[in-house]
Amino acid sequence: SESEVPGMWFGPRL
């Protein structure tokens, strides 16, 4: 998510 950490950002986001 946008408010999540970079690790999660590159996960669910992509």
Curated annotation (Swiss-Prot):
Keywords: Amidation, Neuropeptide, Secreted. Its main location: secreted. InterPro entries: Pyrokinin_CS. One of its GO terms (cellular component) is extracellular region. One of its GO terms (biological process) is neuropeptide signaling pathway. It is found in: Secreted. Corpora alata and to a lesser extent in abdominal perisympathetic organs. One of its GO terms (molecular function) is neuropeptide hormone activity. It comes from the Eukaryota. The keyword DNA-binding does not apply. The modification Leucine amide is found at L14. Shows a weakly myoactive action. Belongs to the pyrokinin family. This is Pyrokinin-6.
